[in-house]
Amino acid sequence: MKANYKITKLLGEGSFGKAYLATVDNEDKKYVIKQVIMDGMTDQEKRETFNEAAILKRLDHPNIIKFKEVFRQSQPKEALNIVTEYADGGDLEQKIEAQKKKPFPETQILDYFTQICLALQHLHKKHIIHRDLKGGNVFLMQSGLVKLGDFGIAKGLKTSKEKAKTTVGTPYYLSPEIINNKPYDTKSDIWSLGILLYQMMTFKMPFNAQSLPLLSIKINRGVYSPPPSVYSAELRDILKRCLSQDPEKRPSIKLLMIFYNCLLLRIELITS
């Protein structure tokens, strides 16, 4: 670990490493150091680790966790340390859990939703698929900013026509094309965005099962309980479009932003 970083807290740990909260000498800011232990990794796992750092370096957007630096260490074990800004408001998964079944106001959902869309818009313009969009990877700042993070399995494509093939992601958020081992593109992120939107509207998953085979069946059927009618028909329509079985029928991020602006205008007209 670099001498100028002072570790203040262990934030979490996984199979390949740990995440620490740290401060830097003569700075007011807090940082997260994701330390990935590379001893025992396969070549593919090492490539994925370097890939996360490489993608973070390419990204500069207010709604994406800001990259500070990356450095390697050889003692006591070979490790790669990825340093990013710290989100002081927790994550969206924690926020949904803390809401304790009290419905989010539609304006709050739209605020979160549009900021996630802006982050995805930046990614998709660079032909990057996040591939693990979920509440635990959407970080909140006390200022109200929403920041997309954790690019451990993100995939950079060479062109907008190229598709990814690897089956990766969190099961409940997997799109039908990934479940069925078909090539996929940025529209797979739109599906995951729809799952997250449904969570914010209902506090549950649209497709739930105790095993991956059963979950796959439910995702392929595409049948889910409708969200509460307290939310506008326009918001429910956005959800329906995001969860289209056919990726070609899902809106692009650009089109989603148009839907959002129309919905925002409607709310302003009603409340004025």
Stretches found by the model and what they are:
Residues 18:
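Conserved N-lobe ATP-binding subsite of Hanks-type protein kinase domains
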Residues 49, 53-54:
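Regulatory alphaC helix of protein kinase catalytic domains
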Residues 66-77:
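Short beta-strand micro-motifs within the conserved protein kinase catalytic domain, predominantly
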Residues 75-85, 93-94:
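A conserved loop-to-beta-strand element in the N-lobe of protein kinase catalytic cores
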Residues 112-113:
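Activation segment signature within eukaryotic-like protein kinase domains
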Residues 189:
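Conserved catalytic-loop aspartate of Hanks-type protein kinases
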